[in-house]
Amino acid sequence: MTAMRNAEVSRNTLETKIAVAINLDGTGISRLNSGVGFFDHMLDQIARHGMMDISVECQGDLHIDAHHTVEDVGIALGQAFSKALGDKKGIRRYAHAYVPLDEALSRVVLDISGRPGLEFNVEFTRARIGEFDVDLVSEFFQGFVNHAAITLHIDNLRGKNAHHQAETIFKAFGRALRAAVELDPRMVGIMPSTKGSL
């Protein structure tokens, strides 16, 4: 029987108080309360398209702006992801996904490598989506990458609507994560690296 791949992480600073939980083998259920509506909508895309159960509770310094909230949720989710993944034996490790939404198309390629790295190539067509600063999209992914220790390439290949650009990115990220953490029946108990470690 496969061990449960889930984890909980709490992170408390002077800027945010966060509790997150993740189940890598879930059904796409999310309970999200970051205090930032658009961000919750994007996190829901990761859960639904990644078939992961994700819970986020955050009290942040939103009287300043959403920067600390979004970045710190990325950090906490990255920590929870790494913890839930465990020793990484048997996973497929590499994955990619293309996701369209009307005129927008994004590609996400990732490697659960043990080496944090983000290549974020997105030129949003406007600076804000409602009240949400689009610069925070890369801040979320940088926080996640640094603490999940994955290599992540995000490219928005085309798009005119900034909401569509963001949504295709998060959907593709969820789908790529789902494929990368999938257990390969031919790799049971085997580390997916010629080095023998990740």
Swiss-Prot record:
InterPro entries (UniProt xref): IGPD_sf (IPR038494), ImidazoleglycerolP_deHydtase (IPR000807), ImidazoleglycerP_deHydtase_CS (IPR020565), Ribosomal_Su5_D2-typ_SF (IPR020568)
UniProt keyword Transferase, yes or no: no
GO molecular function: imidazoleglycerol-phosphate dehydratase activity
Known EC number: 4.2.1.19
Signal peptide: none
Catalytic activity: D-erythro-1-(imidazol-4-yl)glycerol 3-phosphate = 3-(imidazol-4-yl)-2-oxopropyl phosphate + H2O
Residue ranges the record marks as coiled coil: none
Domain of life: Bacteria
Gene Ontology biological-process entries: L-histidine biosynthetic process
First-tier enzyme category under EC: lyase
Compartment annotation: Cytoplasm
One cellular-component annotation, GO: cytoplasm
Keyword terms, alphabetized: Amino-acid biosynthesis, Cytoplasm, Histidine biosynthesis, Lyase
PROSITE patterns: IGP_DEHYDRATASE_1 (PS00954), IGP_DEHYDRATASE_2 (PS00955)
Family listed: Belongs to the imidazoleglycerol-phosphate dehydratase family.
Protein known as: Imidazoleglycerol-phosphate dehydratase
